[in-house]
């Protein structure tokens, strides 16, 4: 049976626990499997279905400074080190495809003995709970930083108030009979009004979003800076954003020069310039097929399919009955969204009916799930409260910073006039 083509590969090393040694080779990610092959003999040292992965983490050990670990069902942990271009890039790509695999509504059951539905849910919720706890710690630390920044701005405001009083003393000495010195003008009032008008300037029109998908974003040629983000297709533009929503670049429809499709999960978008470097972003996404159909309609003359894409289409065509190829998210090529009906023999129909009627979650698992969901709900509510508080703190910081900047500029102009 032919091996699935790789979506992405990384040179690195794998720890063979039975031999207590590290082996160099290549880590490869395919549509359904994570593999590691040795560099010398080209033999597979590890092959793991994405559906069996429970957790992906970045860790450190006494043997190697930094490593990437993959926890398999059965509490079996795989260690990867010396990953190039960097560990963070590999982590972001693996986590993205693994998460999309978990969230896929058409996730198939593997050929090996699978866990029950209740155990799968417990495993998924426990992972989400751990991540939410880590997020809560980060949010608390971030909130403390915001509080320190607000205290610092309050101190700056008090210092500016003292500076204003001292400048007023210098501008209007007690021996001067008038309220203002003759060299003062109305320029300050005009500049302040202009600054306020700039702050209250309205934003532009909001375009309609056609489709938005999560993706791994990086500049073409800089694979070491892979980070999670998103690709948003609008009516007249394309937006590439970071995971926090910050806009990296907006390609207007007429500015896009070419879109290369490397495989069903990876594309590049380029805007060419004369006399300066081109702007080119490369995007990896497990849901890229959702965007490809729109891109082919909007940019049909600019979309170019590479030869690597044909490998994925031919592989999927030769293995239509693969148990791991289900759903449009994991279809290897465009146009495989339709499911082929399977004929069931009459003798096996009763067995299928009995299998459907069997309970998928036991009462004990349901009780455990209920408790875990309650804990997850409490953590989410605490995180939401902290986020709302930090949103208010950010508004205060923004207003205080603008006010302090305006006062500093005004005091600077006043001091220059006094010199």
Curated annotation (Swiss-Prot):
Matching SUPFAM superfamilies: SNARE fusion complex
Question: In the UniProt record, does the keyword Phosphoprotein occur?
Answer: no
Q: Which residues form the t-SNARE coiled-coil homology domain?
A: 108-170, 356-418
Tell me yes or no: is Repeat among this UniProt entry's keywords.
yes
Which InterPro entries does this UniProt record tie to the protein? PH-like_dom_sf, T_SNARE_dom
Q: Which PROSITE patterns match?
A: T_SNARE (PS50192)
Output the GO biological process annotations, alphabetical, semicolon-separated.
Answer: exocytosis; synaptic vesicle fusion to presynaptic active zone membrane; synaptic vesicle priming
Keyword terms: Coiled coil, Repeat
The entry's family comment says: Belongs to the SVAP1 family.
Q: What does this protein do?
A: May play a role in intracellular membrane fusion.
The molecule here is called: Synaptosomal-associated protein 47
Q: Which source organism?
A: Danio rerio (Zebrafish)
């Amino acid at each position: 049976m032919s091996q699935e083509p790789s979506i992405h590969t990384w040179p690195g090393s794998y720890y063979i626990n039975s031999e207590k040694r590290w082996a160099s080779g290549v880590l490869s990610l395919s549509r359904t499997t994570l593999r590691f092959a040795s560099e010398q003999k080209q033999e597979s040292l590890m092959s793991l279905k994405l559906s069996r992965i429970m957790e992906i983490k970045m860790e450190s050990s006494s043997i190697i400074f930094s490593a990437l670990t993959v926890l398999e069902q059965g509490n079996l942990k795989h260690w990867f080190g010396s990953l190039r271009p960097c560990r963070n890039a590999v982590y972001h790509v693996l986590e993205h495809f693994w998460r999309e695999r978990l969230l896929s509504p058409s996730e198939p059951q593997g050929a090996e003995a699978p866990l029950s539905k209740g155990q799968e849910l417990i495993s998924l919720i426990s992972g989400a709970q751990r991540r939410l706890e880590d997020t809560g710690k980060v949010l608390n630390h971030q909130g403390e930083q915001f509080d320190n920044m607000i205290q610092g701005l309050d101190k700056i405001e008090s210092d500016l108030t003292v500076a204003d009083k001292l400048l007023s003393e210098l501008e209007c000495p007690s021996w001067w009979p008038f309220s203002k010195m003759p060299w003062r003008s109305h320029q300050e009032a005009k500049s302040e009004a202009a600054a306020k008008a700039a702050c209250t300037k309205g934003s532009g029109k909001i375009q309609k979003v056609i489709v938005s998908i999560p993706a791994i974003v990086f500049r073409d040629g800089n694979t070491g800076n892979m980070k999670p983000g998103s690709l948003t297709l609008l009516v007249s533009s394309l937006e590439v954003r970071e995971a926090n929503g910050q806009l990296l670049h907006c390609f207007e429809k007429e500015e896009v020069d070419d879109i290369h499709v490397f495989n069903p999960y990876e594309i590049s978008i380029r805007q060419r310039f004369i006399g300066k470097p081109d702007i080119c972003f490369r995007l990896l996404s497990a849901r890229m097929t959702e965007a490809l159909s729109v891109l082919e309609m909007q940019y049909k003359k600019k979309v170019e399919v590479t030869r690597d894409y044909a490998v994925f289409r031919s592989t999927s065509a030769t293995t239509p009955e693969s148990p791991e190829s289900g759903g449009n998210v994991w279809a290897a090529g465009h146009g495989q969204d339709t499911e082929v009906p399977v004929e069931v023999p009459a003798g096996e129909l009763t067995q299928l009916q009995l299998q459907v009627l069997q309970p998928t979650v036991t009462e004990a698992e349901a009780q455990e799930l209920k408790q875990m969901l309650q804990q997850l709900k409490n953590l989410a509510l605490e995180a939401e409260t902290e986020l709302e508080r930090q949103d208010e703190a950010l508004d205060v910081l923004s207003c205080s910073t603008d006010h302090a900047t305006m006062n500093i500029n005004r005091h600077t102009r006043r001091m220059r006039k006094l010199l």
